A protein has these predicted regions:
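C-terminal helix-cap and adjacent tail motif
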Residues: 47, 162-213
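Active-site microenvironments that recognize anionic phosphate/pyrophosphate groups
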Residues: 1-98, 206-213
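Short histidine-centered catalytic/ligand-binding loop motif
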Residues: 101-125, 176-184
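A short glycine-rich, hydrophobically flanked beta-strand micro-motif that places a catalytic Asp/Glu
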Residues: 137-150
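Secondary-structure boundary elements
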Residues: 131-138, 201, 205
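Active-site helix/loop of acyl-thioester processing domains in fatty-acid/polyketide metabolism
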Residues: 120-136
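Histidine-centered divalent-metal-coordination microenvironment in nucleic-acid enzymes
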Residues: 105, 147-175
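Glycine- and small hydrophobic-enriched segments that form the cores of compact globular domains
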Residues: 75-89, 110-117, 121-125, 149, ...
Length: 213
């Protein structure tokens, strides 16, 4: 049996929509969990749309036009840590979580096209960051996300899930995050500092302005 085409996948899903073109809300799954941020009674999915003709272009598809074509700016306000091969940026433009940090290689690649040397370092870097994030007093767990639908250059998001706020667990965390009050920039900087120090101790490099405020 050959792998399923997107047309067949869509047709199989579309066979389950109602007269209004919507799939039913799966209340027995995550929408029924206590950590789901929305009340289910008034919740409905948007009508299902057919596949687009092509995948949309992403930022940085052309390596020459990607941000990595330029050297790291050591004066960037969002830069938390960097070395010769990687950088970490702190989410200063509005975070509802104790910390949201973006890990990216400086060589142009995505997850499926990483050179072996980059892939070999990735796990160690993620482990260092996760350990430092989970050491913050306001954090109960580090969460890791990779999407890549907007940008072609690999970027992993590490988030600090707030400690003991049990509604904010699991995959709905980002839905909660967008509705939480913004954390003050000085608090984000103080939370980023021990993470940057841990990276510098384990992987060398330099601590950026975002962790020196």
């Amino acid at each position: 049996m050959e792998p399923e085409s997107i047309e067949d996948y869509y047709e199989r899903i579309a066979a389950h929509v109602g007269a209004d073109g919507r799939l039913p809300v799966a209340v027995e799954e995550m929408p029924g969990w206590d950590i789901f941020p929305y009340e289910v009674d008034s919740l409905r999915l948007k009508p299902l749309q057919p596949p687009a003709a092509t995948e949309p272009a992403r930022r940085g598809e052309d390596a020459a036009a990607c941000w990595c074509a330029n050297p790291v700016d050591p004066d960037s306000d969002s830069l938390m840590w960097w070395n010769e091969r990687w950088k970490v940026d702190l989410g200063f433009e509005g975070s509802g979580l104790p910390i949201m940090a973006w890990l990216s290689p400086l060589v142009h690649c995505d997850l499926g096209t990483m050179p072996p040397a980059v892939a070999a370092e990735l796990g160690s870097l993620v482990g260092t960051m996760a350990g430092a994030i989970e050491g913050l007093p306001s954090v109960g767990r580090a969460q890791l996300a990779k999407y890549g639908d907007g940008g072609a250059h690999l970027h992993l998001l590490l988030m600090g899930r707030p400690a003991r706020m049990l509604q904010l667990r699991g995959s709905p965390l980002l839905d909660w995050e967008e509705n939480l009050p913004r954390v003050p920039s000085e608090v984000l900087a103080s939370n980023g500092r021990p993470v940057a120090r841990a990276l510098a101790e384990a992987h060398g490099g330099w601590i950026g302005p975002a962790a020196q405020r």
